[in-house]
């Protein structure tokens, strides 16, 4: 097996073991910082909606930003939009950085450096690639936290006692890519 294939297999196995460990750790992770961002997003969206006389809020979206893995900002974009999601400017945009990603990136780096015996002579660029591969796998964890935070804000706080039709659709996915609907519990 050539070095590139060996490296890819190693990074994927490393990501799988790391994510398996972290899912249990983060599934009960507090979502207050994300909830605050969602609340601010919705408040800004309502203000913009009144200012623009725009349609009602139709979507709340969390976008995964691949560029943030390269810039090491580890940001996720939150958008509130009306029906014209990609056509017009969104009603509101905010960014959320999970407080655990910077620390995890450092731990991943340390583990990759310590495990150089498995892939000898990992360059700095290859270590950075390994960090990106592992953190890309955090999307599942972020999706769990997103669902939990959105349910709290929409169903327990801002949209409590509202008809289900009044609650905007909640989506998640790659920026300018495929989006998935998040089914939220409204009870």
Language model features by range: what are they?
Residues 1-12, 107-117:
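Short N-terminal helix-initiation segments at or just after the protein's N-terminus
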Residues 1-11, 133-187:
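Acidic, proline/glycine-rich low-complexity IDRs
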Residues 8-57:
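Short N-terminal edge-element motif at the start of the domain
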Residues 26-33, 130, 134-141:
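Conserved aromatic-histidine-acidic binding/catalytic patches
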Residues 42-53, 73-88, 116-118, 134, ...:
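Short, Lys/Arg-enriched charge-dense amphipathic segments
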Residues 45-52, 115-122, 126, 149, ...:
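Short secondary-structure junctions and interdomain/linker hinges
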Residues 51-108:
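Aromatic- and glycine-enriched beta-alpha-beta binding-site module
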Residues 91-137:
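Low-complexity, serine/threonine/proline-enriched polar segments
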